[in-house]
């Protein structure tokens, strides 16, 4: 029932609808604000879908929707510019995607979040939160720490092996 979290979710669903509408028709929200429970976090989840226009293809749709609004915010281009200005390091794989493009044109991808990245003998993992004008700094930090909870637990378990 947090007004900030609800407003953030509404913004993200609207952004997804807008992104899909570039190359799809019949864009709709299949389900809205379902709660999904994980070991360290609870997420509001909505699914937005559409039917690809005849003159569009999976690759164009991917390009037009990437990065996901959940990692960029809105307005997407300006939010990404601000992220680039403020964040001290390039995000690397975080917020990118992993997946495949089939020879038949099929495309399946997932956003890289809550993932370990091993680089030059160092292990990296990242999390973020939706920071807006009415955000509570402490709550946003707590959200990031909660999101990293499962990865942190995995490190502690691995240290005992």
Predicted regions and their residues:
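Extended alpha-helical targeting/anchoring segments
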Residues: 1-161
């Amino acid at each position: 029932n947090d007004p900030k979290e609800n407003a953030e979710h509404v913004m993200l669903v609207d952004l997804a609808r807008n992104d899909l509408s570039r190359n799809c028709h019949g864009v709709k929200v299949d389900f809205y604000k379902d709660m999904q429970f994980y070991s360290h976090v609870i997420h509001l989840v909505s699914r937005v879908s559409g039917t690809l226009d005849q003159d569009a293809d999976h690759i164009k749709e991917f390009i037009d929707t990437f990065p996901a609004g959940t990692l960029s915010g809105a307005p997407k281009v300006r939010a990404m510019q601000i992220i680039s200005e403020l964040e001290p390091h390039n995000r690397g794989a975080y917020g990118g995607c992993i997946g495949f493009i089939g020879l038949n044109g099929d495309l399946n991808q997932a956003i890289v979040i809550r993932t370990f990245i091993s680089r030059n003998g160092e292990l990296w993992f990242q999390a973020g939160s939706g920071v807006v004008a009415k955000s509570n700094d402490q709550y946003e930090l707590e959200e990031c720490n909660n999101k990293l909870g499962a990865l942190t637990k995995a490190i502690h378990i691995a240290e005992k092996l």
